Regions:
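Bacterial N-terminal signal peptides that target proteins for export
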Residues: 1-9
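Bacterial N-terminal signal peptides
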Residues: 8-20
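Boundary at the C-terminal end of the N-terminal hydrophobic targeting segment
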Residues: 21-25
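Non-globular targeting/processing and membrane-anchoring segments
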Residues: 27-133, 146-147, 247-467
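Short, solvent-exposed loop/turn and secondary-structure capping segments
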Residues: 59-60, 71-76, 142, 156-157, ...
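Ligand-binding pocket scaffold of soluble enzyme catalytic domains
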Residues: 67, 152, 225
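Thioredoxin-like thiol-disulfide oxidoreductase module
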Residues: 135-147, 173-235, 243, 248-253, ...
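Short active-site neighborhood of thiol/selenol oxidoreductases, capturing the structured segment around
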Residues: 148-165, 193
Length: 467
């Protein structure tokens, strides 16, 4: 079907104004009806999603997205060969020579257009390796969950999951968790997925004065909230985990959500309390075993860190997400913000755990396509190997602390006599305020500490009005 010029624009406008996904010819303006003469279903929209005309392509992509997972499946069917080739190229990039600057040919215009369309339909950046559909309307996600009898996995993050510069943990989710074959299958088959932004992701730009800049995010955290098919929260998976541990935690949460979906009142409270109290006991036993393996004496059950009076500092919040801290700690230090140390006991256990952490070939390939390169192939190969070793260690630390400190405290919220928030938004607020140390009342996210002096008027903090 060849349609050009103003007709493309007419079709784009018509689609964007809400024509039915399977519109019949009579639904179209006469000029389109004369040329198309048949229904425009998901298969046709999938072809139009890669149209040369940007307006048409965008309208078709948004219509596919509005069709939900069926729209994603239609796009996959229409472009399976190209998607498979791109997927295989990213996997092959894991072993590509360091002198190849674009080992998966992601800059190729046709491939870039294909992947941009896929990301739009999925609702997630870097969707090629996961092919997951994310709802951004919680009510729609819960309706789908009720219809399919599945739990909801609701991700809360800083920033937008479709943007490169969403918060660091969400970027690690896209690179290390969602592409993992076991994680991907579990999320696709057993959950209805949803994400929402808690607040914009704070960004920092370092201008080196010669045209070079470093642009990244700073501070913030993410969590996956597990809801039953009715939208009631039953658990929270805080921050980043190694892939295998993430699967194990989600499998337990899924079983809980399915088991309690038919319960209410005291029966529901008792079932939730039984589960979460059992998890605390299991964490106690795991901690004893981990301590003995590393030659340490068993220690009292840990609690998540607590700030003193006033709003918490960003440097206190940073160690709550170790992998993220590896990226952000040098930048926090540059702003004059001291970063709290990680307890030695976690460091010693992480040294034992780190070599056992398995990263999928998909993740390693994606990392290779994103890695900064100096141009010296031998140095870049050494740096990449060192980066993977360091990443495994920070993943081990993240997994330990998130499960033994933060998740332990969350389990306690559902124990008998405790008061876990019954609605999702109150639970989100409690996690961010009390555990992630990024309370909504602090617009500066702990980055404006009156107790720190840097020789700048107003501490270098400014407020711009966005009209």
């Amino acid at each position: 079907m060849q349609i050009r010029g103003a007709l493309w624009t007419t079709m784009a406008l018509f689609l964007s104004l809400g024509a039915p996904v399977s519109a019949s010819a009579s639904d179209f303006p006469p000029v389109l009806e004369d040329i198309i003469g048949r229904s425009l279903g998901l298969a046709q929209l999938a072809q139009l999603a890669l149209a040369d005309d940007d307006a048409v392509a965008r309208a078709a992509r948004l219509r596919l997205r509005a069709a939900g997972p069926e729209g994603l499946r239609a796009f996959e069917r229409a472009h399976e060969a190209a998607l498979t080739a791109a997927h295989d190229a990213v996997l092959a990039a894991a072993e590509a020579p360091q002198d190849r600057r674009d080992p998966a040919d992601l800059a190729d215009p046709a491939r870039a257009r294909l992947l941009a369309a896929l990301d739009t339909v999925c609702g997630q950046r870097d969707c090629l390796l996961s092919r997951l559909y994310w709802h951004t309307d919680l009510d729609e996600a819960v309706r789908t969950a009720r219809r399919e009898g599945k739990p909801v996995l609701s991700l809360r993050l800083l920033g937008d999951l479709r943007d490169e510069l969403s918060c660091a943990n969400s970027r690690f989710f896209r690179a290390l968790l969602y592409p993992d074959p076991e994680v991907r299958a579990l999320l696709r088959d057993r959950f209805v997925l949803h994400w929402a932004s808690e607040r914009p992701a704070p960004k920092i730009t370092i201008d080196l004065g010669d045209g070079r800049q470093v642009v990244t995010t700073i501070t913030g955290n993410s969590a996956h909230f597990v809801l039953d098919a009715g939208g009631r929260p039953v658990d929270v998976v805080p921050g980043l985990y190694a892939p295998a541990e993430f699967v194990a935690v989600l499998q337990r949460a899924e079983a809980l959500a399915r088991r309690t979906a038919v319960l209410a009142g005291d029966d529901l409270r008792d079932a939730l309390a039984d589960h979460h109290e059992a998890r605390v006991r299991a964490l106690d036993e795991a901690l004893k075993s981990q301590a003995l393996v590393t030659g340490q004496r068993p220690v009292p059950s840990p609690r998540a860190a607590r700030p003193g009076a006033g709003d918490p500092r960003a440097g206190q919040a940073a160690p709550l997400a170790i992998s993220k801290m590896a990226v952000e700690a040098p930048l926090l230090g540059a702003t004059g913000e001291p970063v709290d140390r990680v307890a030695e006991r976690w460091e010693r256990i992480a040294d034992v755990m780190a070599p056992t952490i398995a990263l999928s070939r998909a993740s390693l390939g994606l990392m290779r396509t994103q890695q900064w390169r100096s141009g010296d192939a031998s140095r870049d190969a050494t740096d990449r190997s060192a980066a993977i070793v360091a990443l495994r260690r920070t993943l081990a630390l993240d997994t330990l602390r998130n499960e033994q400190e933060i998740h332990r405290e969350i389990h306690g919220w559902w124990a008998r006599g405790a008061t876990a928030p019954a609605d999702l938004q109150s639970l989100v607020r409690r996690v961010y305020d009390d555990l992630f140390m990024t309370p909504a009342r602090d617009p500066w996210l702990g980055l404006a500490d009156p107790a720190s002096y840097g020789g700048l008027v107003g501490g270098g903090r400014r407020t711009q009005v966005h009209l």
